[in-house]
């Protein structure tokens, strides 16, 4: 089970992993916490959808997410608490952080209980979300981490009505600094029509190498990831092996994805090596 903040996050940072496990026959569930109502819109012909105009971007992005899930082979998708229960909070410090339905302001225990109910229904062995920094500091990503971490415990508590289920492993999505730096070097040579990134922070906060435990090589599923990213047309421009968000900064579409094991059996690996399977040790 993967827990993401907005439609498109699942494809950008975990799309290849989702496609790999879905293709291998694993039960894959995607939980999205908001509709992404505050996203910027790239195509001019869809600019009318934004929250400061028609305000229908969230509904439109449901359709984009449906297409992305189809591309990835994800058959079980849920919105946390149902579509629209929690709203995109916008970037940190934005007035939309104070919206009464903003996910950033949601009661963590309440949201975690909703997620725990899904966990008990689906009974996953592995739960994946963000690290405590939310990858790049977006409030909804930080909140998704908090909610997923609490739900990981909540689902196994006997004090919660229903049959407990204890997920075996909890992961945070990782973006190794060295991997980003290597990508930046390539993009400085060839970024297509996009602006080449100047520094690591142009792409992500970056994860220290010592914190990265797991490397999933899903190269065979690169095309599925790229197709899923194309489905999020309001948010992502795909050009060959590269893409850009609304900031027009080039990034590579990478089908090798990284994670940090937060809770679970310690990987039996040599120093300097990675665990290669999210289900290892189960």
Swiss-Prot record:
Zn(2+) binds at residues 6, 9, 141. Coiled coil: none annotated. It catalyses: 1D-myo-inositol 2-acetamido-2-deoxy-alpha-D-glucopyranoside + H2O = 1D-myo-inositol 2-amino-2-deoxy-alpha-D-glucopyranoside + acetate. Catalyzes the deacetylation of 1D-myo-inositol 2-acetamido-2-deoxy-alpha-D-glucopyranoside (GlcNAc-Ins) in the mycothiol biosynthesis pathway. Keywords: Hydrolase, Metal-binding, Zinc. Its cofactor is Zn(2+). Binds 1 zinc ion per subunit. HAMAP family: MshB (MF_01696). InterPro entries: GlcNAc_PI_deacetylase-related, LmbE-like_dom_sf, Mycothiol_biosynthesis_MshB. This is 1D-myo-inositol 2-acetamido-2-deoxy-alpha-D-glucopyranoside deacetylase. It comes from Nocardiopsis dassonvillei (strain ATCC 23218 / DSM 43111 / CIP 107115 / JCM 7437 / KCTC 9190 / NBRC 14626 / NCTC 10488 / NRRL B-5397 / IMRU 509) (Actinomadura dassonvillei). One of its GO terms (biological process) is mycothiol biosynthetic process. PANTHER family: 1D-MYO-INOSITOL 2-ACETAMIDO-2-DEOXY-ALPHA-D-GLUCOPYRANOSIDE DEACETYLASE, N-ACETYLGLUCOSAMINYL-PHOSPHATIDYLINOSITOL DE-N-ACETYLASE-RELATED. GO terms for molecular function: N-acetylglucosaminylinositol deacetylase activity; zinc ion binding. The lineage of its organism: Bacteria, Bacillati, Actinomycetota, Actinomycetes, Streptosporangiales. Belongs to the MshB deacetylase family. Its EC number is 3.5.1.103.
